[in-house]
Each structure stands twice: as C-alpha cells, then as structure tokens.
C-alpha cells in the first residue's frame, strides 16, 4: 500500500490542479497509515498512543517543526510567540499535523536564539508565559495535536544559576556540574578541542583561574553528565514538562553529552573549516558510549509518561545511528536520520542508495531534509529551473517512505532560503564570525509567509528577520 500510494501522491503533486497545498501532508499520510478513526466521545484524539495493530502514535505521525521566533507574531513586536502558534492550530490541523516540535522557548539571553537556556522550567517573556503554554497544550489537544519540546541537554547558558554558582568558587556547590580544568601550561587550554562555533572549546575564567569546556559558544558551558546530580536535575526537568502536558522531547546535540575524562587531543585533519579553524575529528568529545547509559534511563522516564524521545545525533552512518535505538529499542524511539542532508540534488541513484541504507536500520526511521540549521530543501534539491516541480516530487517521496517525517515550517508552501546580502544584516553569530564564506542560518529562519499582506501576514511591524522579497 505504501509504495503504490507513493506514485499517486507524486502524480498529484505534479498536477497542481489535482491537489491544493492545504492537503499536502494529510494526503501523503494515507500512504503509511490506516484511515484515522474518530475519537471516542469526550476523548481527545491526541490521547491515543497505540493503534489496533500495535503501532505507536509516533509511527503514524507527521511532525512539524516550529521556530517560534518566526512562526506567528500575536502582539506585533516583530517576534513570533506562543499565542501566535495557538492562533494557527486550525491551519496545522488542516495540514494533517499530528505533533509540533517547538524549538527552545525557555528563558535565555538569546546568544544562540534559545539554545542557551537560563531557566528550564519557565517560558521566555518574549514568547509569553507558562499560562500561554498551558493554553497552547490544551488547545492543541483539542485539535488532536501533541506538543514536543526542544530540550537542550548538553549545556546551559552561562547565565543559568547553576553556572553562576559553579564559577563563583572552586569549592562551590555546583562546581562539578560543569567541566573545569587547569591549562596545559599558563595561557594554554587543556587540549586542542575546538568549538563548533569557532575558536578553542575552552574559556579561561578569571575568578578561579581555570578553564571551562563548551562544545558550542563560550556562553554555552557544557554540563558534566558524569555527575549524578546533573542527571537527576535534568531528568526532573522532563517530569516538570510532562506534567504540563507535553508528549515528549527532541534532545538537542545528544551525541555530545560526554567527553573523554583524560582529555586526549582530537585527531586533526587536513585543511581549515569555514570559520578558519583546524578541521578535527571529534573522537574524544562526541558519540562516547556513556551517552547510551543516560538515554536508557531517560527512556524509562519517557515510558512512564507515554513520551517520545527524538534525538539530534548528527550522524549519517547507519551503524552509528542504530546504536541510538538501543538494544531492544530501549533508548531513542526516533533518532534523527540525516542521510538525506548529504544529497544536494535530485539524483535517483543517490536517493536509491540512501533509502536502501535507511531501510537497513534496526528501528523506525526519522527523516530530516530541512530544519533550522539546514538550507531549505527547495533550494538544496532544486536545479534553479524546476524547483517547484522538484519540491513537490520531494514532498511525495519524503511523506510516503516508511518512517516518521519531520516537516520544517514553510516547507509545505515551498519557502526558500534567503541569506542576508550584507554582513551588517546578519543576526546569527556564526554568520558574523564566518562571513562571507559562512553566512549563518538566518536564511532558513525567515518569517512564515501566511498571505500577501504586509510582512506576509507574520506581523504588522518589521519582523526580527526580513520577509524575503520573493514571498508571494
């Protein structure tokens, strides 16, 4: 049924008169699941977890990623918010969306646009309040839509109370909640590890004259997951949100939770990256086996709450990906598969190869073709001439393969990547550091285009990022 219906969907996408964009996802869902049954009286559709065939709800679901800054602005301050998302639930329901993944909406200094969390159990005022969040979950449930939160597990903000205490003294209560080390010698960091966002992964703190480790920005110090107190505190965060009605978490950068305690230097590869740093193999600070111990325990908490765990594993190696399912599928239900992101053109041979590899995986696939860190599929797969047709073909393929798709907002209407034309317009720190070779991620984070009114219906004032001139 799945493969046969894929052809029907693809043909429909190639004939625009046959199918409107508002039914794109809903129609494609039919290829991989039975016709949905109406919920029993008094029972919200989102409460059902297993179907008659024993499939979990997330195996039939279409997930939809929302970057809250850019989705819908309810109070006209130029930044999207939770009330904006709530106002668009009818639209999401009509699309056939079963769950929305909301990127971080917690209090944050916004150095990395929310991926530097200063309080895991609240909502950043720019997005609203806990009351607004509760309203969103309540209204979403009425529409049969589940809420998935982005959980930044690897690090906190340097403004989090844990880190502020940790850096205050070598004997502080939270000192060992982060990774502190002496330098190799005065003025030199403990090893050669580099930050993903440029420069050394070690920053010297003048107060205690020790270095702290950060895989990402200096304002994002890594948590020490070898400390049981850290694990307990972070597990409690998930329980807090489960009680508020969420159905699971997307675990950010889950592969970087552990580092080699002996701090061996990483192997250095030839050349420089786009930020001008040596290219290194993250042998000693990524994908260490200890992460699987944490995932097994976190899965138990998820199972107790009927929750789903999606993992950002950043691997295109099927053998490595399989490890994140765990033995007997006791770790992540949905480790994110980035194989399609390695294909940058519509090549049947390349896609056939990747699909065959995905089908060899030990668990249920979770495909990624676009998100807030990746150039939109419209541009990546397009040839500059037939982009509209290619986008429709990709949608048909993506939504009818065995597995769970995650649609990035705006993909359903063919939104394009629009990077800034000038360095002074760049908001993403990566783009400011790496310009012009690396222009950052602003281009794939522009406001959702709702209609043909001013600012494409996103806001009545100038948005935090400009609406592309190609919007229509």
Question: What feature does the model see in each segment?
Answer:
Residues 54, 58-59, 262-284, 292-302, ...:
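Loop/helix patches that line or flank the sugar-binding groove of alpha-linked glycan CAZymes
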Residues 1-4, 304:
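Positively charged n-region of N-terminal signal peptides that target proteins for export
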Residues 8-21:
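Bacterial N-terminal signal peptides
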Residues 164-209, 343-360, 431-469:
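Core domains of carbohydrate- and sulfate-ester-processing enzymes
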Residues 100, 249-251:
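Hydrophobic residues within beta-strands of alpha/beta enzymes
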Residues 22-28:
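Boundary at the C-terminal end of the N-terminal hydrophobic targeting segment
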Residues 29-239, 243, 256-316, 327, ...:
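Acidic/aromatic-lined carbohydrate-recognition and catalytic surfaces
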């Amino acid at each position: 049924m799945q493969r046969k219906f894929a052809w029907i969907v693809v043909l429909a996408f190639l004939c625009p008169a046959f199918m409107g964009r508002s039914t794109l996802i809903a129609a494609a869902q039919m290829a991989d699941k039975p016709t949905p049954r109406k919920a029993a009286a008094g029972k919200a559709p989102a409460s059902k977890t297993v179907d008659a065939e024993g499939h979990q709800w997330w195996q039939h679901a279409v997930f939809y990623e929302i970057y809250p800054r850019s989705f819908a602005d309810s109070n006209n301050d130029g930044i999207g918010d939770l009330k904006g998302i709530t106002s668009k639930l009818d639209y999401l329901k009509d699309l056939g969306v079963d769950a929305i993944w909301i990127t971080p909406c917690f209090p944050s200094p916004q150095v990395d646009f929310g991926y530097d969390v200063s309080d895991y159990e609240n909502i950043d005022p720019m997005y609203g309040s806990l009351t607004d969040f509760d309203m969103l979950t309540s209204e979403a449930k009425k529409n049969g839509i589940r809420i998935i939160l982005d959980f930044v597990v690897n690090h906190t903000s340097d403004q989090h109370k844990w880190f502020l205490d940790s850096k205050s003294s070598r004997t502080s209560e939270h000192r060992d909640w982060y990774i502190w080390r002496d330098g190799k010698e005065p003025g030199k960091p403990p090893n050669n590890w580099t930050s993903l966002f440029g420069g050394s992964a070690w920053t010297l703190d003048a107060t205690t004259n020790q270095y702290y480790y950060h895989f990402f920005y200096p304002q994002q110090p890594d948590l020490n997951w070898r400390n049981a107190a850290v694990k307990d505190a972070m597990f409690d965060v998930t329980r807090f949100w489960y009680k508020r009605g969420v159905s699971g978490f997307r675990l950010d950068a889950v592969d970087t939770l552990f580092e080699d305690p002996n701090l061996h230097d990483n192997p250095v590869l030839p050349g420089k990256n786009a930020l001008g740093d040596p290219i290194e193999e993250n042998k000693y600070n990524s994908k260490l086996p200890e992460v699987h111990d944490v995932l097994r325990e976190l899965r138990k908490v998820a199972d107790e709450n009927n929750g789903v765990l999606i993992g950002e594993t950043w691997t295109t190696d099927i053998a490595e990906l399989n490890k994140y399912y765990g033995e007997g599928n006791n770790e992540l239900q949905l480790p994110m598969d980035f194989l399609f992101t390695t294909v940058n053109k519509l090549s049947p041979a390349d896609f056939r190869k990747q699909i065959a590899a995905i089908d060899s995986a030990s668990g249920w696939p979770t495909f990624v073709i676009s998100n807030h860190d990746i150039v939109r599929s419209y541009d990546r797969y397009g040839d500059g001439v037939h982009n509209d047709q290619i986008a429709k073909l990709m949608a048909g393929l993506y939504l009818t393969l065995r597995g769970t798709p995650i649609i990035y907002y705006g993909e359903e209407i063919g939104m394009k990547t629009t990077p800034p034309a000038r360095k002074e317009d760049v908001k993403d720190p990566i783009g400011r550091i790496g310009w012009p070779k690396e222009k950052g991620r602003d281009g794939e984070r522009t406001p959702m285009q709702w209609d043909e009114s001013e600012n494409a219906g996103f806001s009545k004032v100038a948005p935090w990022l400009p609406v592309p001139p190609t919007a229509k």
